[in-house]
Amino acid sequence: MSCVLELKNLSFVYGKGTPFEKRAVDNVSLQITQGELVGVIGHTGSGKSTLMQMLNGLLRPAEGQVLLDGRDIWEQPKKIREVRFKVGMVFQYPEYQLFEETVYKDIAFGAQNRGLEGEALDRAVRDAADFTGLKPSLLEKSPFDLSGGEKRRAAIAGVIAMDPEVLVLDEPTAGLDPMGREVLLSQITRYHKECHNTVLLVSHSMEDIARVADRIIVMNKGKLAMFEPTKEVFRRGDELSRYGLKVPQITNIMQALRRRGFDVPEGVLTVDEAFDALLPLLQKEGKLW
């Protein structure tokens, strides 16, 4: 697989040259492969959201480069708008950005600005709605008549309709109830698997990241603390705790069982993995305790 995004010595400074100067991102270098689903974690203020906003030119680096398909996105500043079609950004609580008369028009807005029209536009809108689980009957409704979860899905569909090469999701499940979180996460996973586009998922939920991410970016105090496969990151629980982060709850439970002498594997990150690991023990012993 080819490299779709490369960050070279990337830094960003808020309030540069003032008494309030703060280096939010400090000398970050990494490469992201086409088709990966990358999780992004870090405590509040770690720099993860600032880093994501530099990927599509919403923020311009103080130092370093963002390379998209091998080209510096700031090579031609007047064309930075084109980068934002290729790297789609979904902010936290994106439903507050809905504004059109109908859900259909809202989803179509970005794709129209990219130049789609006619049947191609209609197909893009309906495919994006399908990916995010919006029923066709909702498309002619006002977006303000939708439920909270439906608004969230409509806003995400508007970015998906542009067919970005890279989709950046900043806390997409924030504020949703457990069912809404589950539905949205499943739809993001389906989109990634079927479209083979690169997805970056920022989340405070270690459980969500553990379920879907191929690799994880860990940010701490503006620096890149780790960028490793998911199992490797969560294997380093002591290090994560120093960054104010935790391993998934099910991982803690399985580690406790190992300490009690039960023959369960290391690196269990999800409930499904735990079920597969514990079922043979239950069948053999009849009970755990």
Segments predicted by a language model, with ranges:
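Catalytic Walker B motif of ABC-type/P-loop ATPase nucleotide-binding domains
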Residues: 167-170
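ABC ATPase NBD Q-loop/coupling interface
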Residues: 65-82
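Conserved ABC ATPase signature
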Residues: 142-146, 150
